Regions:
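N-terminal small-domain helix-loop-helix segment of the aminotransferase-like
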Residues: 2-95, 102, 281-282
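PLP-dependent aminotransferase-like
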Residues: 105-166
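Helix C-cap/helix->beta junction micro-motif
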Residues: 131, 191-192, 222, 346
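Active-site phosphate-binding strand-loop segment of PLP-dependent enzymes
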Residues: 141-210
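Active-site PLP attachment segment
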Residues: 218-256
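PLP-dependent enzyme catalytic core of the Aspartate aminotransferase-like
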Residues: 222, 332, 341-350, 356-386
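Structural signature of PLP-dependent enzymes
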Residues: 255-261, 280-303
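Conserved glycine-rich beta-strand-loop-beta hairpin in the small C-terminal domain of fold type I
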Residues: 278, 294-303, 315-327
Length: 386
């Protein structure tokens, strides 16, 4: 079956954060929204059909996640990432941001140092600061070939840290970390008893010619010193289902984490989240394959257009995610002026780079998970200003 990713869907009036909050966020309601990391493609038919079938039941009472739910995730990860997991390592969380917050609250103490690698997904900062932990920033290094990790600084920071939260693949810069990069990071963390929380929500959005390496798959030592977060929400556009999974091979760590989840009553979930996830994991291979090809074409088109028509914008070829990270520093304008021009002159709603850390000043994150015609229109509007 061939899936249609060119179809335009009007999401206005659906309580969509991405569309219906444009006026609140940007001060202008008619910008093309390319900010929030969800996709504008139709929900896959096999997911929609599974939800509709469940909706036909007469009672929407409390449910649990049966073995088949977790087994579908085990098999997906095995097929796509060659990592042999076990359902006994898995636990439900109501979204990965929740999973990170639960890990911070349940596995660290107030004042503990937690390392992140900016520019990075901004809820990492909130999870640390909001719970009175100490934020330690290990900024990535921007090179001509792309962003790399600062291991020398990490060696020093790890000596007094309790946890490191890694974005693997990295949001927003689009790196799919190589095995050797993760090995070096993992060895530093193991040697200093720093627990690794690996947010792998974008693992199924790695582009052709690149490969995702699950952090915990590298060695038993890394598996025993890590929590991996996985979800179908980015890949199959199910963010509204608030459903994700943590994978914890260490029995003692698993028990401590799951006991804390129980103590917060955050483990009930919802009926349709588990139905949608299981349908995606069991039936989504072909849809996923076509999605990756379409996203890759969108990204290639955008990168080529920018290099040709707006060469002052610096942009690396992403290896994963459906976002591109745009650097406007050569325009020598302020962050505020960049945002004003993008919204009120170009008519585009992108994520301001500064939310990902000070390293993102005068940068922007652009979401390309939309029909090609929208990408083309947006880039032409950007060209008229930049």
């Amino acid at each position: 079956m061939t899936y249609d990713f060119d179809k335009i869907i009007d999401r206005t009036g659906t309580e969509s954060v991405k569309y219906d909050l444009r006026k609140d966020v940007f001060g202008k309601a008619d910008v093309i929204p390319m900010w929030v990391a969800d996709m504008d493609f139709p929900t896959a038919d096999f997911i929609r059909d599974a939800i509709i079938e469940k909706a036909k039941t007469d009672v929407y009472g409390y449910t649990f996640r049966e073995d088949g739910y977790f087994e579908s995730i085990v098999q997906w990860i095995k097929r796509h990432h060659q990592w042999e997991t076990k359902k006994e390592w898995m636990a439900f969380t109501p979204g990965i941001v929740n999973a990170i917050n639960l890990a911070v609250m349940g596995l660290t103490n107030e004042g503990d140092k937690i390392i992140v690698q900016p520019p990075v997904y901004h809820p990492f900062f909130y999870a640390i600061n909001n719970h009175n932990r100490t934020l330690v920033q290990n900024p990535l290094i921007d090179t001509d070939e792309g962003y790399i990790m600062n291991y020398d600084l990490l060696e020093e920071q790890a000596k007094t840290a309790k946890m490191l939260i890694i974005s693997n693949p990295h949001n927003p810069v689009g790196r799919s970390w190589r095995k050797e990069e993760l090995i070096r990071l993992g060895e530093i963390c193991v040697n200093n008893n720093v627990l690794v929380f690996s947010d792998e929500i974008h693992c199924d959005l790695v582009l052709p010619a690149f490969k995702h390496t699950p952090f915990a798959s590298i060695s038993e030592e890394f598996a025993q010193n890590s929590i991996t977060a996985h979800a179908a929400s980015k890949t199959f556009n199910l963010a509204g289902m608030a459903t994700s999974t943590v994978i914890i091979p260490n029995n003692n760590l698993y028990k401590k984490y799951v006991d804390f989840i129980h103590s917060t009553e955050a483990d009930l979930g919802n009926i349709f989240g588990k139905i949608a996830t299981k349908a995606a994991m069991e039936n989504g291979d072909e849809w996923h394959s076509q999605l990756i090809d379409y996203l890759n074409d969108n990204i290639r088109f955008a990168i080529d257009f920018i290099h040709k028509e707006m060469p002052k914008i610096r942009v690396h070829n992403p290896e994963a995610t459906y976002m591109i990270w745009l650097n406007f520093k050569d325009y020598e304008i302020s962050d505020d002026e960049l945002n004003r021009k993008m919204v009120f002159e170009a008519g585009l709603g992108l994520n301001s780079g500064h939310i990902f850390g000070k390293e993102g000043e005068c940068c922007m994150r652009m979401n390309l998970a939309c029909p090609r015609s929208v990408v083309m229109k947006a880039l032409k509007q950007m060209k008229n200003v930049f």
